[in-house]
Amino acid sequence: MTETRRLRILITNDDGIKAKGISLLISLLREADFADLYVVAPLEEQSGRSMAFSLVEPTALEPFDYPQRVQEAWAVTGTPVDCVKLAIGELFKENALDLILSGINNGKNSGRCLYYSATVGAIREANLHGIPAIALSQSENIAFFQEAHMASLIRSLCEFTVAYKHTDPLGLNVNFPASADDSPWKGIRFTLSGNEFLFGIPRLVRTEGNRRYYTLYDMRDKVSEEFSEEYLALANNYISAAPLVSKNTPRATLSEEELAFLKDSFEQSVLWKASLNLEEDLA
């Protein structure tokens, strides 16, 4: 019997290499034990940087003594896109990566917010280089993340994303719901990205002479009259998984038939209810 080849997975994020979310993701991947793990992540938080990269100033790259066992770990003084570019073009150019993961982000990246997200920006960069990728984000706060059974789900998502064949590599944007009463997640749903939007309200924090300093961190939801399937999935305690090649993204490469096939394939390959004690079946 032929042994399945272990995947080579790059892990990055936008919360920084010391963040709780990336540590959780590595723990789950180590538990699933199907891949060799390589970490290239920002030294400092880079939230809201989208696909920005260091065009003018040099970016520093240095080995990082990661507390969990990984093949290699590197810290970068730039953005998540810088991390992906350096990983593909320098660190691992002789040994191709199979998949790139970004997260787990502290806060959701659903709806139109994915255009601002540096977590998702890293995934878009990976796709541009022909590498499949997954963004993972926890709604509200990383403290809401439920670790039970997640190693199995993460592995299923990874293997599905790598195996999916299309003209362009698959990018998935996965969001985990925040259960206010700690009720277990019901399952996972394949959705399209919604039109919901988080916008920042300018807040004056101080004035120095003629210069005024503002923050945009006070975020408010702007929801359409008709809720998207992504929004409803999260609101009803389901994990959402939205393809970045769907019709509302710049890379609108899937026909309706291909999108339907992707949805069917996802539901057949990734649904994890058979091995878990879920409260209800998926619709």
From Swiss-Prot:
Its main location: cytoplasm. A divalent metal cation binds at residues 14-15, 47, 105. It is found in: Cytoplasm. Disulfide bonds: none annotated. It catalyses: a ribonucleoside 5'-phosphate + H2O = a ribonucleoside + phosphate. Its EC number is 3.1.3.5. Keywords: Cytoplasm, Hydrolase, Metal-binding, Nucleotide-binding. It holds the Pfam family SurE. One of its GO terms (molecular function) is nucleotide binding. Binds 1 divalent metal cation per subunit. Its cofactor is a divalent metal cation. HAMAP family: SurE (MF_00060). Nucleotidase that shows phosphatase activity on nucleoside 5'-monophosphates. This is 5'-nucleotidase SurE. The lineage of its organism: Bacteria, Pseudomonadati, Chlamydiota, Chlamydiia, Chlamydiales.
